[in-house]
């Protein structure tokens, strides 16, 4: 109770600070403070002009924009090429109606819907919906026999926006739901989300700039037993600009999660980042220090928080508009909330908590990370991002395997470890041909528990697409990962999810599409001990009215 009172007092103080900022006679100019605007290059990733509005990328389950890669990745982060189709900006008009729907065998029904009924002057409104699911047989793995189940995910919401001359104000609400059945239990997860955002447009000026993002989720999970969830986040940035290309900025915020029912617990993270931003010529510097504190009821996380972390970025335009070198040195922490874990793996429930290593919900603590990279392009047809780095985790989530009787069960725990990596992203695009992808090499060591499953040494994806006369679009893609294993000897096989896709465009408003997946019929365990069975094909229609 005392812990919750402290959280409420801290949240009230943050809201009061935000209200004070709003009450000043300021130009309504807001922007995310970590955006760097200088004379550095922007490497754009050209794409074939397909037929999905950018707004539909609200359906992405989240990206981690930290310096370090997310150490715990679920099965929903890879999105096949057909699901990534997007139009050029000229395809959007005042009143947009977009629908993409498909079904096939095995049963993978999909639905994307966007309706923009109001775009008058500065005001806009978008209504959207999304559905992804699998219904059918799952493969037999180890001592687990084949079984029939389903995994359904739906999202629907409404967004409102107001575009001032120097600021953007957005707010909205949405529903997010998961229903799944596996060999252990059934689950129904329902969540209602709401957010408010205020962002300035003018970055490099003498004016006071600020940014406020507020989000709240209420969720109810009925899996092993019923649990209520409250997630709240507040992020604010502010600072004084300067025409000389430098300024001092402050980022601050909090994340809080509270649980009742099957689990009585709460946790919160508070952070502040003062940093100095300087740009001159080809050089851009962002020198900051992150101060962050994580607290949990009953001291559930123990002494996991480092409190002070580096937060430094340097960009150097070696060849203006062609080659940029960057260096990031960072660190930080992040709450692994019940909601965020479920969105990465729909099968997770409270039974996943690994005995002796804390509860299912924990905190990722990155002591320090360093990334050196080169981002550039060769002519207007080829762009790339090559980087190498090192990460030292004090605590990070990892898959693990336990047993109940003679049957394996999936689990999740937290461990310190270190990682070195090298990664390459590339895109080659001509008028009718596109080839892009990414590949990462990981070398991890220092994982403490023998039951933890390590990282894949190599993972990535690639896609090749051809557009014939803007009428037929076709290609092949592949998402792949090498095998993983634990020190105790449990092995997760590697895989290559080979797919083909095609689209026939009747006109600007209607097209038909087809996708085939897992053509090599491999055992793909993106979620530990869960693998959908067999080759699959999905066909559908796309309307853009």
Name what the model sees in each region.
Residues 119-139, 247-251, 255, 265-297, ...:
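Surface-exposed extracellular loop regions of Gram-negative outer-membrane beta-barrel proteins
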Residues 78-83, 90-99, 103-141, 148-156, ...:
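Outer-membrane beta-barrel translocator/receptor signature
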Residues 134-159, 169-209, 213-231, 261:
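Flexible loop and strand-edge segments within Gram-negative outer membrane beta-barrel domains
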Residues 100-112, 121, 148-151, 221-229, ...:
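Solvent-exposed loop/turn segments connecting transmembrane beta-strands
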Residues 22-89:
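N-terminal periplasmic/intermembrane-space "pro-region" immediately following the signal or transit peptide
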Residues 284, 295-309, 313-545:
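Exposed, low-structure sequence patches enriched in small/polar residues
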Residues 95, 109-113, 152-158, 190-196, ...:
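Hydrophobic, lipid-facing positions within transmembrane beta-strands of outer-membrane proteins
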Residues 101-103, 127-131, 171-177, 212-218, ...:
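Transmembrane beta-barrel strands of outer-membrane/channel proteins
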């Amino acid at each position: 109770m005392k812990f919750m009172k402290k959280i409420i007092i801290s949240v009230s103080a943050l809201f009061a600070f935000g209200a004070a900022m709003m009450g000043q006679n300021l130009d309504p100019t807001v922007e995310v403070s970590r955006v760097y605007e200088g004379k550095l290059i922007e490497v754009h990733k050209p794409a074939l002009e397909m037929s999905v509005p950018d707004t539909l990328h609200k359906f992405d389950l989240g990206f981690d924009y930290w310096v370090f890669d997310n150490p715990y990745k679920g099965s929903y982060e890879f999105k096949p090429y057909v699901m990534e189709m997007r139009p050029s900006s000229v395809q959007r008009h005042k009143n947009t109606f977009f629908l993409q729907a498909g079904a096939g065998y095995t049963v993978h029904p999909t639905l994307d819907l966007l309706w923009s009924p109001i775009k008058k002057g500065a005001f806009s409104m978008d209504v959207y919906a999304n559905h992804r699911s699998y219904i059918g047989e799952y493969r037999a793995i180890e001592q687990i026999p084949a079984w029939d189940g389903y995994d359904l995910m739906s999202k629907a919401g409404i967004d409102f926006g107001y575009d001032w001359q120097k600021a953007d104000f957005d707010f909205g609400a949405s529903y997010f739901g998961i229903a799944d059945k596996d060999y252990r239990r059934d689950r129904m997860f329902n969540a209602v989300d709401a957010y408010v955002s205020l962002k300035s447009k003018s970055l490099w000026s003498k004016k006071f700039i600020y940014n406020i993002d507020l989000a709240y989720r209420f969720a109810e999970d009925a899996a092993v037993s019923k649990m209520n969830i409250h997630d709240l986040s507040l992020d604010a940035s502010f600072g004084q600009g300067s025409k000389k290309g430098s300024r001092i900025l402050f980022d601050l915020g909090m994340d809080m999660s509270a649980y009742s029912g099957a689990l009585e617990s709460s946790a919160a993270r508070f952070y502040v980042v003062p940093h100095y931003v300087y740009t001159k010529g080809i050089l851009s510097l962002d020198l900051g220090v992150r101060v962050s504190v994580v607290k949990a009821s009953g001291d559930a996380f123990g002494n996991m928080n480092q409190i002070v972390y580096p937060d430094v970025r340097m960009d150097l335009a070696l060849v203006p508009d062609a080659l940029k070198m960057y260096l990031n040195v960072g660190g930080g922490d992040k709450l692994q909330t019940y909601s965020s874990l479920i969105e990465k793996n729909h099968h997770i429930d409270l039974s996943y908590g690994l005995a002796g290593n804390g509860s299912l919900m924990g905190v990722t603590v990155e002591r320090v990370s360093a990334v050196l990279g080169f981002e550039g392009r060769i002519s207007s047809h080829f762009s790339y991002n090559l980087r190498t780095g090192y990460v030292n985790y004090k605590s990070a989530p990892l898959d693990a395997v336990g047993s109940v009787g003679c049957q394996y069960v999936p689990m999740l725990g937290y461990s310190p470890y270190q990682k070195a990596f090298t990664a390459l992203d590339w895109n080659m695009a001509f008028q009718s041909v596109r080839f892009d992808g990414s590949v990462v090499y990981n070398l991890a060591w220092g994982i403490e528990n023998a039951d933890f499953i390590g990282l894949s040494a190599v993972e990535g994806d690639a896609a090749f697409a051809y557009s014939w006369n803007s009428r037929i679009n076709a290609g092949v893609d592949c998402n792949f990962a090498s095998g993983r294993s634990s020190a105790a000897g449990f092995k997760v096989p590697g895989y290559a999810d080979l797919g083909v896709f095609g689209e026939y465009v009747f006109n600007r408003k209607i097209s038909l599409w087809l996708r085939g997946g897992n053509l090599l019929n491999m055992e793909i365990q993106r979620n530990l001990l869960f693998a959908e069975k067999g080759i699959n094909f999905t066909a559908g229609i796309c309307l853009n009215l």
